[in-house]
Amino acid sequence: MTNEEVAVLPEGFLIGAATGAHQIEGGNVNSDWWEWEHRQGTPCLEPSGDACDFYHRFREDIALLAGFGLNAFRFSVEWARIEPAEGEFSQAELNHYRHVLASCHEHRVKPIVTFHHISLPAWVQQLGGLASDRFPALFERYCDRAAGGLGDLLDYACTINEPDALPTGGYILGVNPPGRTGDKDAMRRAEENLLEAHRVGGAAIRSQADVPVGVVLALPDIQYEDGVGPGDSPIELNSRLSDRFFELARDDDFVGVQTYTRVRIGRDGPQGADVDWEQRRSETPETTQMGYEYYPQALGNTIRRAWRSTGGTPILVTESGIATSIDEKRVAYIEAALREVESALADGVNVRSYLYWSLLDNFEWSLGYRPKFGLVGADRRTFARVPKASAYWLGAVARTRHVPTTRGCDTSAATVR
């Protein structure tokens, strides 16, 4: 292989896959999202139901991930399971997550654990959710109890998944619970609460576990057309909140970068995905099943933004991926994204991981099970796992620390039952 064909990643670099509890575990009946999915008039195309049954199949899935050669697994512990009613903590659920963590260690896979990944306990939402004045203290107490029960098995802890995108999703766009639109006052309260929740939640985790702690942010690569300045579109509001989290991350052990595409903003506002699934699913060479522009190069720009904005806090790429029915396109996307990582490393940026989203084809929130992000398929009836060629390709990268061209893609696949 020539130098143009191979990038060499550093010793100890983590390459793995990411997931979120509500999207793969199944039966998350005490969560706000479970209620949201079953509410009359819900925007969700289908309910999460049993999801991928990861709750009962985690050993199989972690063994599968390790068998590919991947060395890191990001997953979330579900607040709605650990504290299903206010002040009532489930030791059985903490024990369950200890088993998940132990399985990671058994297979020499580093667990990267998120304490809050989008879904809330239903009772928290009933109290006012992210906009409630009580939210930071409730999250702090939960983090203290969860880290107290799990801390000795953690390798990395992420406080909140994409807190920079949650306020607009729930209070401006209405695509997440509680489903309000245009409520800027509630959005601002949620923003302040999430900033404080990260501070106090992170401190609670550190008090219980000697592990690196950070926040993971939603970072599309925003590009303005010539002559166009910042506006107040939801994605720009998110970006301004990202900047505030970057300031907090100066004191953190790492910051997580989660990037899928770029968003170009012109005089008519952001040029992005159509909200209608029937149009989104018409995937083209230039777009994905989410309606996103196919632009893996976005990752290099957002890594550098995070590095610059935090003053040099180490970077974990905690999500990068593509929804596609064409696995060769997935491999090409991952290769291009990894080239951006290699370029950032060459420029002196301290990037420590690349985690692909997602390990499994999973529940993609309001779009249900239609977008296919996974390295592994999951039969909706039998739950049989069907590894894709992309899983083997990424595993080979993890084993060798070399990023070959997609001409070297192994197209073999097998069904695991």
Locate the predicted segments by residue.
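Non-catalytic scaffold segments within catalytic domains of secreted glycoside hydrolases
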Residues: M1-I62, A66-N71, A80-R417
